[in-house]
A protein has these predicted regions:
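Short, well-ordered amphipathic alpha-helical segments that serve as non-catalytic structural scaffolds
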Residues: 32, 133, 228-232
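Phosphate-handling architecture centered on phosphoinositide signaling
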Residues: 1-126, 135-136, 140-144, 148-149, ...
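Short beta-strand micro-motifs within the conserved protein kinase catalytic domain, predominantly
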Residues: 150-157
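Detector for Asparagine
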Residues: 32, 40, 80, 154, ...
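ATP-dependent phospho-/nucleotidyl transfer catalytic cores
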Residues: 127, 157-259
């Protein structure tokens, strides 16, 4: 298993380095053994305090280059530039034997520059719901993030009432959002927008990445020689988004909550 940090290093302008903040008496309570084996993750991570030390100790590999991502988005029909990872941290990327690269992302990791006065924590109730729901979606053949492991704690997190705190590590082929691109477009930081597109194409659309000025070619058919590649990649983006929308609508999936 090789842990890499391509997003954090290649797009350093789009992230903030954040040290994960542990909850008290953190305990590993659930592990997705099959997913860990798929990515050849070290078995000693999932015994006793192994992965907890990897995230939170000074010697641990997982927390050393943890970053929070900056992005914007639309809320209640209005553009909001003040979003970002308010309680989650990208720990790095790992690959399986087939070359598929997935992010490791810690949720409930504490405050970040994008927490907007929130505590950056997650509660047991919603964390368990996400853990089970993500795996259920995956095994139903519906595109989703995956649940790698979950931690419980006796530390109380205050919502409407005090609740037990929790954390989880989820995995996904990408944590890129439309809001990443929207933020740098609206802020007119076009150099960063170009770098973001380069990264996206290299990781997710390598055929298009081999073209001259691929990040521009994907969105603007300015050269006849690349027109077929452009159309194909736009078709793939549309196709993948359509698949997700179709199955979510069939299941009455609303606003990232499971009911």
């Amino acid at each position: 298993m090789q842990l890499s940090h391509h997003y954090a290093t290649d797009l350093s302008e789009t992230v903030s380095a954040v040290t994960p903040q542990p909850l008290s008496d953190l305990t590993l309570c659930l592990t997705n053994t099959a997913l860990a084996e798929q990515f050849n993750l070290p078995t000693d991570w999932f015994t006793d305090q192994g992965i907890i030390e990897q995230i939170f100790s000074e010697q641990g590999a997982l927390g050393k280059q943890a970053v929070a991502q900056k992005y914007g988005g639309h809320q209640f029909g209005q553009w909001n530039p003040y979003l970002g990872d308010g309680r989650g941290l990208l720990l790095g990327e790992v690959s399986d034997d087939k070359g598929a690269q997935f992010d490791l992302h810690l949720k409930g990791a504490g405050q970040t520059p994008y927490s907007r006065h929130a505590d950056g924590r997650a509660v047991l109730r919603s964390t368990l719901r996400e853990y089970i729901g993500s795996e259920a979606l995956h095994h139903l053949g519906i595109p989703s993030s995956r649940s790698l492991c979950m931690f419980t704690s006796n530390e109380r997190v205050y919502r409407e009432l005090p609740e037990p705190g929790a954390m989880m590590i989820r995995m996904a082929s990408s944590h890129l959002r439309f809001g990443h691109f929207e933020y740098y477009f609206h802020s007119k930081e076009f150099d960063i927008l170009d770098k973001l597109m380069d990264f996206t194409l290299t990781r997710h659309f390598p055929d298009c990445a081999s073209q001259t000025e691929p990040h521009k070619a994907l969105l603007k058919a300015s050269e006849e020689a690349t027109a077929s590649v452009i159309k194909e990649n736009l078709r793939l983006i549309h196709q993948e988004q359509s698949k997700i929308m179709e199955v979510f609508r069939c299941l009455h999936f609303i606003n990232t909550f499971f009911f």
